[in-house]
Every structure is written in C-alpha cells, then in structure tokens.
Amino acid sequence: MLTRRRFIQLIATLFGSAFATACARALAVPTAADPTAIPSRTATASPTATATVTSTATSTPTATPVPPSPTPTFTPTPRPTDFVSVRGDQFYYRGARFPINGFNYYPRLHPWRTFNFGEWEPAVTEQELKLGASLGANTVRMFVDFNASLTGTLTNTLPDAVGVIPNRQYLASIAEFIEIAARQNLKVQFTLFDGMDWSFYAPEKFYLVQTYLYTIIPMFANDARLMCWDLQNEPDRAIRTVGANIVIPFFQRVSNVIRQLDPRQLQTIGWIDRARTQYFPDLDKYLDFWCFHFYDQAANLPDLVKLYKSKTTKPVLLQEYGLATGGPGPDGANTEQDQAAHYDSVLKTLDENKMCGSVFWCLNDFPVGLAGNPPLQTDHPENHFGVFRLDYSEKPVARVLRSYWKPSS
C-alpha cells in the first residue's frame, strides 16, 4: 500500500522537491471519496429522465494520498475569461460564443503512439497542427494512452501504486504538445485513460487511479490552453464488459478527484452508443457537457441530435465523425467526393440545430501497418479517414470545412 511518506519520496525523485513540497502541504488535509460529494460547477438544470443506473460505489481505501495543490505549472495565472466556459447549451471564450471547430489528432507516422518513447516528434506535430489550424480549427483532441504514460510503450500493465505514477518524459512531451497547440491558437481536449485495462474500473483498484490522477492532473491544472478534461474515450466498451454498475461510479469518482485538483476546467466523456443516454441522470451533475460519436449515414443525424438535446440542457458536442475514402469492404467504398458531401450534410445539420460544434475524425491518413492498437497489418478503412492525404495534400473535404469554419486570413 502506498503510504504518505512513500508518495512524497517518489514525487520528489521523479518531479523535484518543489512539486513534492506542494504534495506534502496538500496531504495534510484528508478528503472524502464519496462520488456524490462534489457537484458540477455548471448551473444548468437536469432534465427529467428514466432508466437510471443504481450506483454501487464502495469506499476507497483510506491510504490513498490526497492531491497536491493545483498550482499552474506552465503559464502565468490566467484570467477567468481565458478558459472555455459553458452558458446554457453553448461554449463561450473571452465573452463571446465559441463554437468548437476541432479535429482528432494522431501523428501521421505514429498513430495511437503520439507520446511514446522514441516516437514523439514535436517538429512534425507542429507542421500537422498548422494544417488543422489552416482549416479554421480552434480545438484539437489528443489521447493519453494509460500504459504508455507509465512505461513509454503500449504494453499492457497491471502496476501497483508505485507503478501508476506517470513517466516524467511522457509528461514533458504532453506539455510540449500543449505549447505547440497554443502557438496555433488551438485549445486542447485532453483525453485520459486510453487503452486502460478493464480491471482498473473495480472499486478496490481506485486507489491506483487516484495516485495516477494526483500526479498527472496538477501538472496541467489551471491551464487555460486546455479546453477540457475528457475522462475517457468511448467507455461504452467498458460498460459492455464490466457493467454499468461498476463503470458509472468509477467516472463519478474520477470526476470528483479531477474537480478537486482542477476546479476551473470543463469535464466530459465521449460516447459512441446512443443507448448511453440512459446514464445521463447519473452523470449530469458531474460533467459540464456531453459528447457523442457518429459514424452512421448523415441522413440519420437529425434524429440523433434531437434525442441528445431532449436528454440534457447542457452543450452536446459531436466529438467524432468522418468517412473513410479507401480500404477494403463497404466501409471503404467511398470516394473523396462522398466524404466531402458527408461532411457538408453533417455540418449543415449541426448548424440548423444550433449545436455547439464538432470535432472530426481525423486530420491525416495513415500508412498501412500503423493505425490501431494493436496496429492493423493490412489495409483498412481506418487508414483513410484523413482530411489530408499521406503527402499532406488536401482532400476536397478541406474546402467544405473552410466554408463552415471560415478561417481568418
């Protein structure tokens, strides 16, 4: 079990004495792990809904360290208006409405391994984020692989409390990414726990998750260059595997820990299955806005938008959508013109319904043998979702995005 003293020693070794001192100050005040203890900071009303899941949360082991003070690490103290905020069902930034114009990002040659040891290439990322910004984007979504953040590789691990402290080099690469994004005026959606083993959802393992969060969140807390904490990508799979009675309380606890460490920053989760709206009542007071992913025919989007808007008064962001322009099978049997028409239809639907924005999948095409976790060794539609081809030339869909996003010259 990780004791208070051992936690401070580890932090001092890995991150230096100043950060360890901040941890020691915070460890003097214990806090509750009750998943219902901290309400969301948005003031929107929850709609009436049914089919809620019964929370079966159990208490968290008491030996878990209390989080360090959320002191900003990389930037001066920002003004409140420097953060993206929520009013009603829209986002605001510096006093004005801020429609999310975003893209999901993996490097062209290192998909699913952005920050892995030996694969992080900041100059390439700068070049690629410039391409996204040239479309009129104001937001980029990136992914922190849970295993890679500990070991530098995608190797699946089941660590103890010592082993769940994120690697210093990996965190430095994330910090560099945020700096690069800021130079392109891109807010960052910071997606946590990608690729995490199912066993970590169990209540008895939550002290490990807390230890992880107590290290990674303070490094980027109070940083207005972030748009939000995305608690996990598509946890629908976890619900199917370990059950909603485990997964929903897990995210309630995660939200509370992050809210304590970084109270200003927005929080969300991206769902792919429309059935997950049944859990909105259980998470509505924890999350500041909702996200959904859409890979269906564009003609089916209007009904889905109406469904989501009927379930919450908070912003509902289309966080993934796209169309592959190659690869075997029916999912790859689309032309680049089909892709452009699909985007046009999707963006038109969002505008007509006064939605808060969208984040397309994805910026670049990928070479065969790299995309996926584990990588797909033969050609697949996953390699062909990009708005930019392998040589960085634009597909016709780029013109569609610019027509809606209207980038400044």
What are the language-model segments listed below?
Residues 361-409:
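Aromatic-rich peripheral "rim/lid" segments of glycoside hydrolase catalytic domains that contact
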Residues 358:
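Hydrophobic, well-ordered secondary-structure elements that form the walls
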Residues 21, 25-81:
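Ser/Thr-rich, Proline-interspersed low-complexity disordered segments
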Residues 236-240, 308-343, 363-370:
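Active-site clefts of carbohydrate-active enzymes
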Residues 6-26:
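N-terminal export signals
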Residues 83-293, 298-299, 311, 325, ...:
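Active-site mouth of glycoside hydrolases
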